[in-house]
Amino acid sequence: MMRKLAACLFAASTVLCVTRAHAVNTIKQPGLHPAYTFEAEPHLLLGFDLPGKGADKHGSGFGPGFRGTIELVDNGFVPSINNTVGIGFGLDWLSPGDRNVFWVPVVMQWNFWLSDRWSAFGEPGAGFYFGKASGFAPAFYAGGRYHFSDAVALTLRLGYPNFAIGASFFL
């Protein structure tokens, strides 16, 4: 009985160690990520510090949006790791109070493919608001994705001037 238990524990720990080692080493294997040229990301977002805070004092808003990223470099700035670089653009509709504000960001997206299930990214850039309020603002984001498959991922983006959660489709 003890021999069977020991064999099962050994087999389970071997499988877990091999799986964990694969996940750890993926970042060190350039090019080991889904093959795509465009990432389409519909999302919901919470914006804050919106321009045009009038008498209604609404500085935040909630709404739907879309981000599209075109992959520019398959093996990004650091050739020894699994990274890509793209240009991202979007359109977000925020409705703070009784007014509508649209946010149009343009960012550089630097992706780090950590494992077959996880990736992270940073996005510096800028954008402009228009609608009942208008203005120009810097944009800084950091985010992560949980990949259900090579084609679909759950995406979380945190930064300034908004937070977003959505689904990424790698086309």
What are these regions (language model features)?
Residues 1-33:
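Cleavable N-terminal export/targeting peptides
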Residues 36-38, 58-64, 98-104, 118, ...:
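Residues that define the transmembrane beta-barrel architecture of outer-membrane proteins
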Residues 89-117:
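Helix-adjacent hinge/juxtasegments
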Residues 21-74, 93, 160-161, 168-171:
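Short glycine/proline- and aromatic-enriched beta-strand/turn motifs that initiate or cap beta-hairpins
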Residues 42-46, 64-70, 91, 106-110, ...:
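Residues on the lipid-exposed face of transmembrane beta-strands in outer-membrane beta-barrel proteins
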Residues 24-37, 73-85, 98, 113-119, ...:
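Short loop/turn motifs that connect adjacent beta-strands in outer-membrane beta-barrel proteins
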Residues 38-42, 83-89, 104, 120-124, ...:
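Transmembrane beta-strands of outer-membrane beta-barrel proteins
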Residues 48-54, 74-76, 93-99, 114, ...:
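Gram-negative outer-membrane beta-barrel proteins
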